[in-house]
Amino acid sequence: MIRMIKGQIYFTSKYPNIIIPEKPIPHLILKHIRSKPDQVLLVDGLTFKEYSSHFVADTIEKVACGLNKLNIKKGDVLGVILPNLPEYVPIFHGTLLMGGITSLVNPDYTIEELSHTLATVSPRYLAVTLAVYEKIKNDLKRVFPSVEKVILVDIAGQTLKEIGQLTLSSDGIVMSFNQLINNNGKDYPIVRIDLKKDTAIIPFSSGTTGLFKGVCLSHHNLVSNTHQTQTVETTNYKKNDTVMGQLPFFHIYGLMTYLILMVKQGHCVVILPKFEFVRFLDLIQKYKVAISFIVPPIAIMFAKSPIVDKFDLSSLRTLFSGAAPLSREVEDLIKERFKGKLIIKQGYGATELSPACFVIPSGLIKSGSAGILLPNQLVKIISPETGENLGMGEKGEICIKGPNVMLGYYNNEKATNEVIDKDGFFKTGDIGYVDEDGYYFIVDRSKELIKCKGFQVPPAELEALLLSHPKVADACVVGLSKGDMGEVPRGFVVIKQNESLTEKELLDWAHPKIANYKHFRGGIFFIPAIPKSATGKLLRKNLKDINPPKL
């Protein structure tokens, strides 16, 4: 719908504005799961252990009590470096219940990656597995000088005995999750929270370009997006639906879907710590999963893998794909394979939008569309050349305003002002348009950001890594299309004068410093000079399609 404001064109949602509850996230969650105490809310996909709503609610409050005993204060940060585990849910909500902030990162991150993500928000507490602790313990005081307590969470195959030994030998800094929740769940204060100003979580995003930044999302941001999404998505769920929980909880897509939306709606979530396609299919069959939230690489497996035919997936009703665009070709292949019985939907968003802004309504799918604008939001589409507001059907940068727009980037006013304009619109960096039915189409993803397996890989981060090598004079990183993976990083390097360096030497040096999905699967090429504009901006597009010989 078009709205004219001061002579400028804006677009509103087809849905009427909704009332956003004025409650902190954990209060909202506890209210809903306490109403169905005997329902199975979580299932450990490795051990098959089931957790009732009553147990989860009690454990949330026990985490709050445990943190209160550790003297947590409003605004203190608890860094979560965990794979998907049932304990993630009470740790997340228990921290928020005490007015704390959870900051979530990939447990596969190296020390170097943790140092410029989680360490930048000065966490007072960490929640980790034994494997993560072993990785960080020697650098703990250097990388995390602010940390006072490390909470070790058990995982299948790891014994409590191992954790117990660590708690006795680490100068009191380490405790087990079981020690944290060894209380009655009653002794914690009610913390007053400013819903619109107080940060609840700090996930990390690169925005459209640059290094990763902490994204400050308030309780109001999260509650708003929960209800905005439910307005469109409620008809897609049935009362006793079971959902697969394989998307990473540290990613805003998985966080909002499983830790908030599904838990609030009371759907049982079958949790997988690490994605394995065969186990994933087996769990769908075993638990008669109805809905699975996926990323395009998983969609491609559904479309093409012969393994799919070995499982009874008749319970599966809907696949919801996000984090990166899903091609129409893959969508058609899945529909053909499942004889049209499987609904495939997409949405669009960003970490900075908490995360959803467009969702395809049930039964109203339009090919190639990112969906319809969720309620309580305003859109303007601006010309990349002139900055003027454009009309229906005209292609420009999509900008979003609403209660789901982030507070800002953590301790980075400059970066915040670059993406949120003076009127409060978040500039997505993506080019698109809206049609006469209110469906939005993304025609050009942010040019610089590499999307690998649904994860964001900022070229600037990898360029900084390459440039730190003593023999590298200049570097540029671009995304290379790579089938099921989406895009993979490809590096271009200028070697310092009078130095010699091979691709293998550089890869062997770089890969241990970065997560697996950031590896240079597109290779590293050596060239005489990196193309740049007159202002010194890297001309990545000039390098996208060239394949120079490797030295």
Swiss-Prot record:
Pathway this chain belongs to: Phytoalexin biosynthesis; 3,4',5-trihydroxystilbene biosynthesis; 3,4',5-trihydroxystilbene from trans-4-coumarate: step 1/2
Q: Where does ATP bind?
A: S205, S206, G207, T208, T209, K213, Q346, G347, T351, D430, R445, K537
Task: Please give the cofactor(s) recorded in the UniProt entry for this protein.
Answer: Mg(2+)
Under Gene3D superfamilies, the record lists: 3.30.300.30, 3.40.50.980, Luciferase, Domain 3
What GO molecular function terms would the record report? 4-coumarate-CoA ligase activity; ATP binding; CoA-ligase activity
What is catalysed by this protein? Answer: (E)-4-coumarate + ATP + CoA = (E)-4-coumaroyl-CoA + AMP + diphosphate; (E)-4-coumarate + ATP + H(+) = (E)-4-coumaroyl-AMP + diphosphate; (E)-4-coumaroyl-AMP + CoA = (E)-4-coumaroyl-CoA + AMP + H(+)
Which family does the entry's similarity section mention? Belongs to the ATP-dependent AMP-binding enzyme family.
The job of this chain, per UniProt, is described as:
Carboxylate--CoA ligase that may use 4-coumarate as substrate. Follows a two-step reaction mechanism, wherein the carboxylate substrate first undergoes adenylation by ATP, followed by a thioesterification in the presence of CoA to yield the final CoA thioester.
Q: What is this protein called?
A: Probable 4-coumarate--CoA ligase 2
Q: Native species of this protein?
A: Dictyostelium discoideum
